[in-house]
Structure formats: C-alpha cells, structure tokens
C-alpha cells in the first residue's frame, strides 16, 4: 500500500474511535454520574 493510503486509514480510524468514545461517554452507563449545570441553576 502507499503511504498516503495508510495515513488516511489511520486518521479515519482515529476519528471514528474518538467519536465512538464520545458517544459512549455521553449516553453510556457512566452518563448517570455526569452533572447537568442547567438543572443545578434552575430559576
């Protein structure tokens, strides 16, 4: 394979991994422990 192809595959995999981890953090089981600043400061 060419070097450019390997770099594109690596960067795409990295971005996909970061996106998947962000979604898991936002909506996964650990999301119950996240605080909601809007609920803390209701007027």
UniProtKB/Swiss-Prot annotation:
A GO cellular-component term linked to this record: chloroplast thylakoid membrane
Entries under InterPro entries matching the protein: PSII_PsbN
Residues making up the signal peptide according to the UniProt record: none
Entry's Gene Ontology BP terms: photosynthesis
Membrane-crossing residue ranges in chain numbering: 4-24
Family recorded in the similarity comment: Belongs to the PsbN family.
Name of the featured protein: Protein PsbN
Organism from which the protein derives: Trieres chinensis
Originating gene: psbN
């Amino acid at each position: 394979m060419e070097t450019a192809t390997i770099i594109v595959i690596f960067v795409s995999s990295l971005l996909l991994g970061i996106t998947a981890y962000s979604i898991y953090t936002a909506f996964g089981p650990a999301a119950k422990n996240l605080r909601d600043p809007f609920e803390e400061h209701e007027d």
